[in-house]
Amino acid sequence: MSLRRSILALVSVIITTITTPLHAEIPDALFEKLGLERDSAPNVLYDVIVKRYRDVDQGAGEGKFSDLWEPIPFSAYMAPQYFYEAPEELDFDVTRTECVECHQSITPGWVHSWKDSVHGNLDEIRGLDETDSRFYKKEMISEVETNLQSMGVLGDGEHLNVVGCIDCHMGVGAEGGNHQADLMMPDAAACGQCHVQEFAERESERDTLDWPQDQWPAGRPSHALSYLANVETGIWAGMENREIAEGCTMCHTTQNTCNSCHTRHEFSAAEARKPEACSTCHNGVDHNEFENFMLSKHGVIYNTQGDEWDWELPLEQAFEQGGQRGPTCQTCHMESEGEYSHNLVQKVRWGFKPMPAIAENLEHEWFEDRKSAWVSTCSQCHSPSFAESYLDLMDQGTADGVELVSQARVIMDSLYKDGLLTGQTTNRPSPPEPEKDEAGPFFGFFFSKGNNPTAIDVEFAEIWEQHNMKHFKALAHVNPGGFTYSNGWAKLIRSLARIRDTDTTLREKAALLERIRALEEAQ
């Protein structure tokens, strides 16, 4: 390289450093936990993050119950970094250009998606003017090139011509390779090589969730450690029906890949900004966020007017320039203190399961600070007093639900302790390892043998794992029917009534049997 090119490259780096706040949206906590300075070079930041990302002692791998289960063929696509191996029939060499030429006929859907992506149209993006909503992506391409130059993948001043199949599936800049030996299914670290900023933001979820009273393990619940949460759930590891288990995995892949939100092979940011992008996982009996959002006034605004909004603009411009007049999952959960990032847990307060240990500590500074952050978020559309009053309503309503669960738990634990559950002393087989038997267990949704679980076990499990979650989620997403009597409170009351009835029935039966035994012994 000439001296002139070296000087120009250095000047460019200096100017960028002066005019652009480095890693502005990455929380301080990540740098503190990893022992890095905020102005660390992209290659340094990436290497340190990847080292932790792939460390089995810090959440990577198959989990502490790995000896209890074996992957099935589909597992290779859920956790490709652990299980994917290319088929033997792919043992031949390919070049960069041959990828598209061949797959145009074999898997045209892939190619069509890629041709519509930014990856396939870098020069088009570079030619945009400021009136185009995608103009900001020009800077992103430059940032990616700076990252790759820092890593030595690109030379100083060298530009990307296109991001093709081979760049993601064999290595950035590769011109050819063996279709079997060199082929990989990209994990999040592969995306992070180019998208260091976004990768770091997502990984910072581990660092911004330190629960003050240890209500949850550090860094959880989060997208960054979602696969760990999955494989270290006892019944997931212990159940024989691996195909059903992989259904759980399908919503726990965000730790492994980025395409849960940015679907391949277009990886559209506009698609990922819409609530439907979240809906595949954030729905159902224990986390029905999507349904509650859609039934809220926020969702009504989105449903009736969202097709008029400009989804190509970055989130921070959605309200002022994009015509957006109601929040989405993304504008609420990706925002913190006015900045938007791929860390979605910086304002988490109730976690993924309301519990007494949270309800009893909401006045702690940690929770209060996060509540203030929510008031700030809501105040983009509401007055601060309105926002605070609703958050107070949500907190108290959620705590009320927690109290009903606690009442049910006392009854169920007492029945279990006294051995009075149906068949408990005669027909209650142990659950699969590593699960331990208890009243109303989570494993009761995935295992049934003899009288384990009993009908009332399932009823109690529905209270704490489903009804209470729906109650909280409806409160949090402002769907009134969802926390009053369509779901939530009314179903909590109904199940609690059934548990109380069953408690009375079982205890009266036990007392009657005891009287019969006494009479028989007296004869």
Where are these regions (language model features)?
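Bacterial N-terminal signal peptides
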Residues: A9-T17
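Glycine-rich beta-alpha junction loops
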Residues: V285, E335-S336, S385
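A conserved mid-domain beta-alpha-beta active-site/ligand-binding segment of alpha/beta enzyme cores
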Residues: C329
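Glycine-/alanine-rich, low-charge beta-solenoid repeats
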Residues: C261, C278-C281, C332
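Cysteine-rich micro-motifs
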Residues: A189-C191, C278, S379
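Long, charged, low-complexity terminal extensions
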Residues: I26-P73, M78-A79, I106, V345-L362, ...
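Sequence context of c-type cytochrome heme-c attachment sites
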Residues: A24-R273, H287-Q324, S341-D369
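Bacterial N-terminal signal peptides that target proteins for export
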Residues: M1-L8
